[in-house]
Amino acid sequence: MTVNLNIVEKCVSCLNIKESYDLARHMEQEKTNPVLGYRTAGSLAERKTGDMLLEEMKKAGLTQVEKDKIRVDAWKFKKAVMRCHDREGTCREIQLGAYQTDFKTNGFQRFDLVYLGKGTADEYKDIDVKGKLVLIEINQREEWWINYPVYQAHLKGAAALIAVQSRGYAQIDDTALNAQDIAGPSCAPAFSMSRADFLMIRQLMEEKNENGNRVPELSVEFDADTEVLKDQYTYNIVGKIPGTDSDSMILLSAHYDSYFEGFQDDNAAVAMIIGIARALLRGGYKPRHTIVVCALAAEEWGISDTKYDWSTGAYRQVFEARPEWSGHVIADLNFELPAHAHSTRDAVRCTYEYADFVRGFVDAVQMPKGIYPEGMTTLYPIETWSDDFTMAISGIPSMVNDFSGGPFMENYYHSQYDNQDVYEEEVYKFHHEFYLRLLLAIDSLALPPMDFGRALAGSIESLDLDLCMQTGANGVLLLEKTEEAKKAAAILSEQVRRFNSIPEEKRDWKKADAITEKLLGVFRKSQDYLVRLDWDDNVIFPQQAVQNNLYALKKAMGYLEKGEIAPALEAFYSIDNNCYAFQFEREVFYHFTEYILKQSPDRLMWGKGRIIHHENLYDLVERLKEKKPGDSLEAEKQSLKEAWERQKRYYADDIEYLIRAAEKLRNLICEVSDMFEKGTE
C-alpha cells in the first residue's frame, strides 16, 4: 500500500476531540421522555436529531448531504411513573423505563401489582393476574430475553409486565434502569424498574401482606404512555467526500437513535465519524475512493414482533434506500461505544475476508501508553450486535471497534448511566487517530484487500468428519471441493496484493473498478453461502447448528438408555431453542419459534434465511418432566431416535449444500482471477 505519511499526519493533526465530544453531548437535547431521555425509532426526537446532524455534516464540508427516507415501526415512549404509599402514608413516586410496546393510561390509574419471581409458566399456577401488573426479576444475559416472560404475562391476562435486572445488565448501581429491544409483539406491554425501587416495593409488599398471602401484592397508581406505530418513516443521514480516481466507496457508519442519553451508545460514535471526515477536509485530503459518512437511524429497534428487530435502519439503507452500495462500497468502518476502554486490550472485529489486512495494520500500530496495557488485536468474524453484520450480508465488507465484551456491557450498557461520566478522552482520541489512519490505508488501495480463503478454512475447521461418517454425509468430498476453492482463493489473494502494489501513477482505475465490483460480488455470495445464525444469534457456518444438535441428541439418548431423565433433559437445552420449552407454556414457545420459521421474509430482515432447520422437542420435554421413577421410557426413546434420524438427514443436506457452495465459490473466484489477465470488458 502507498500512503503519503505527510498528508496522514496532517489530517491527524486536524482532529479536534473536544469538537467531537461537544457534538456527542449536543445530540442529547432531543428526547421522547423528558425525564429519562430516549431517542427512539421514527420519533420526532430522532428526526430532529437527524436534521441537526444533516447541518453538522454540511458545516463540516461534506457534499451531497442528504436524508434517505426509510420505513420503520415507530416507538414513542413519553412516560412511565408509578406511585405507592408506605406504611406512614407517604407517597413514593418512581420512574420506570419501557420497551417497544403499547400501553396508555391517560393519567394515573390504580392497579394491583403482584410479584411472580422470574415470570415463568410455573409461577402463574393458581394465580389470577388478569388486569394486574406483574413484577418479575430477569437475567437477560444468562437466562432468557425479555420477550418470553412478557408474552407469558400477556397470555395470562396481565395488564403489563415490569422487569427488574437481577443480574446481566445495569449492574452499576441499584438505581439503574435497563432497556433492550423487545423482540415481541407490541400488544404485550413491558416496563423496567430499578433494583432500588424494586427492593422498596418488595418491602412494602411484605409489610402489607398481613394475611401471609402466597403471592406478594401491592396496590399502586400507574401513569404510562408508550406507543408503537406501524409502517412509519425516519431518515438516515448521508454525506460524502468525493473520490478522485475510483467509482467505489468507503463507508463510515454509526447510529444516532438511543436509549436514555446514549452518550457512548452511540452519540460518541456519530460525532467521531463526522469528526474524522472534518479532519480529512481540513487537512486537504483528496480520497481516491469516495468516502461516505452515514448516521443510521433505528439501530436499537425498528420493527415490531420479529426476533431481528434491531439494525433496522442499516437494513433499510443497504437493501432498499441504497442497494447500489452493494458492489461499490469496499469497506464499512462501523462504530459503537468508542469513547470507553471495554477491556485491557483493544480490538478491531471484522469479516473473515478482511482479517489478514486488518491484522497487518493493527500489528504495526504504536499503542499509546496508559489505556490498553495488553495492546490491540484483530477478531473475526463479525457479530450480530451491531450494524456491521447487516452491512456484511448486503455485500459490504465491514468492521467495528470491538465493544461487546468487558464490564461496560454488564454495568452501563442501555442504562441511564451511559452518560458523560464514562467518557475516557484518551481512548476517544486514540480511536479517532487509529481509524483515520486505517481509513486512509484502505483508501490507498486500488482493490479491496480481501482473502476468501480464511472463511473457507473456517468452514472446514468447524466440520466434524467423524460425525460425517456416522451420518453418511459426504465430508470427504466437501474437504476436497473446499481445498480447491481455497487454492483458487490463495491465487486471487496474491493477484490482489500485486495489483495493489502497482505504483499509483501506473494504476488502471477502470480495470480496478471492474475487478472490485466482481470481488464484492464474490463476497456477497460468500455471505449468502456460508453465514448462518443459531437461535442465540451467534454467527455460525451452515452445518454447525445441526452438528451441535446431533451432539446433544447423542448425549440425551445415552442418558435415556440408562433411565437417567434429568441429564437427558439437560442435554435438550442446547438443541435449537428448546431451553424455553422448560420454562414457558406452549403458546409462548410456538410464537417465538414460528415468527422465525413462518413469518414473511420482509419481516425477518437481516435474519432471513439464516436459520434453516428446527427440532421441536416441546412435547417430549413435557412428557419427560412428568415421568416418575420406574415409568417406561420406550416412547420417549423412540421420539429421540426419530429426532436423530431427522437431524442426520438435515446434516447430509447441509453438507451437500456446502459442496455445491464450495464449487460455486471456486468458479466465481476463478472468474475474478481471469480478469487480471484480461481487459475490463
Task: Identify the meaning behind each predicted range.
Residues 2-3, 10, 17-18, 22-25, ...:
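Noncatalytic luminal/extracellular "stalk/propeptide" segments of secretory-pathway proteins
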Residues 3-7, 93-126, 180-263, 274-285:
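Soluble metallo-hydrolase cores and metallopeptidase-like ectodomains found primarily
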Residues 7-15, 34-44, 115, 137-143, ...:
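Second-shell loop/turn segments in exported
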Residues 41, 94-189, 373-377:
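Extracellular/luminal Protease-associated
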Residues 128-129, 149-159, 176-181, 314-324, ...:
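Mature extracellular/periplasmic domains of secretome proteins
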Residues 141-148, 152, 236, 258-353:
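Acidic/histidine-rich catalytic neighborhood of metal-dependent amide-processing enzymes
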Residues 232, 329, 337-458:
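Active-site-adjacent substrate-binding region
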Residues 433, 443-681:
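C-terminal non-catalytic alpha-helical accessory regions
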